[in-house]
């Protein structure tokens, strides 16, 4: 099981495939997505990676998070999410995941927060048909009608469809197709609509109900860590002098 990624929704557009078919796509941007912590079986009882994405202002970051980011040698992140992974797919702290983590044609599960609609009636919220427009009806044109029975059971059952707050909930869309990726601009184009407003954070993971393509990179499509310290090579002049002395 590989790690997912944190992307930002830019909006929707449409492209044309090789057969001339118009394909509606949602554009997701993956930028500065780095591993900031690991979870191991020995220390935590499970394996996972904690990812951070975006850039947050230092003065608006709490002291606890400042220490968390400085320990990982990464800049403060705007969004932090933890993804469960298998032990063979653990990533080193500081590793940056790129859009090459996914391949065109792959199926993914996309999770976002739906757009809030406020307090909505049953016709908008649950697609009720409503009551008659005339012929003696008044006031209750868009009402839900009966909410239960009489003395027995004497209550409204849980889950009864009624008016209430609509939207602003976590929604996962499964088996969404990755149409294409743009490595230079860090974009992922997925088929169809994705829950969330423009600029919202969207989680993208490998589909749990589809087989991972053989050409998908394992453990992830990564860029070299920025915090890896390279040991400086010995100057050529010093080597020649040392050899001459010997």
Swiss-Prot record:
Gene: rplC1
Protein name: Large ribosomal subunit protein uL3
Molecular-function GO term, any one: structural constituent of ribosome
Posttranslational modification: Methylated by PrmB.
Top-rank taxon, per record: Bacteria
Protein family membership: Belongs to the universal ribosomal protein uL3 family.
A Pfam family it matches: Ribosomal_L3
Metal-binding recorded as keyword: no
Subunit structure: Part of the 50S ribosomal subunit. Forms a cluster with proteins L14 and L19.
GO biological process, one term: translation
InterPro entries: Ribosomal_uL3 (IPR000597), Ribosomal_uL3_bac/org-type (IPR019927), Ribosomal_uL3_CS (IPR019926), Transl_B-barrel_sf (IPR009000)
Keywords (A to Z) from UniProt: Methylation, Ribonucleoprotein, Ribosomal protein, RNA-binding, rRNA-binding
Gene Ontology CC, one term: cytosolic large ribosomal subunit
Protein's job: One of the primary rRNA binding proteins, it binds directly near the 3'-end of the 23S rRNA, where it nucleates assembly of the 50S subunit.
Residues found modified as N5-methylglutamine: 151
Organism, as annotated: Bartonella bacilliformis (strain ATCC 35685 / KC583 / Herrer 020/F12,63)
């Amino acid at each position: 099981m590989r790690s997912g990624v944190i992307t930002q929704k830019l909006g929707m557009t449409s492209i044309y495939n090789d057969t001339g078919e118009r394909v509606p796509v949602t554009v997701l941007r993956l930028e500065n997505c780095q591993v900031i912590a690991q979870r191991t079986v020995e220390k935590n009882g499970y394996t996972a990676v904690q990812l951070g994405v975006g850039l947050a202002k230092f003065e608006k970051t709490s002291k606890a998070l400042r220490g968390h980011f400085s320990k990982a040698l990464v800049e403060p992140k705007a969004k932090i999410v933890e993804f469960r992974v298998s032990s063979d797919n653990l990533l080193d702290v500081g590793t940056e995941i790129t859009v090459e983590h996914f391949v065109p044609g792959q199926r993914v599960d996309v999770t976002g927060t739906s757009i809030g609609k406020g307090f909505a009636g049953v016709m908008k919220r649950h697609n009720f048909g409503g009551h008659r427009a005339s012929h003696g009806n008044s006031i209750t044109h868009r009402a839900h009608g009966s909410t239960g029975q009489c003395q027995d059971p004497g209550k409204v059952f849980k889950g009864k469809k009624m008016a209430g707050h609509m939207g602003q909930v976590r929604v996962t869309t499964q088996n969404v197709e990755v149409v294409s990726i743009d490595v230079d601009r860090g974009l992922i184009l997925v088929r169809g609509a994705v829950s969330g407003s423009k600029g919202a954070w969207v989680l993208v993971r490998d589909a749990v109900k589809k087989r991972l393509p053989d050409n998908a990179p394992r453990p992830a499509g990564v860029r070299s860590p920025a915090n890896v310290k390279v040991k400086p090579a010995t100057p050529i002049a010093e080597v020649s002098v040392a050899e001459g002395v010997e």
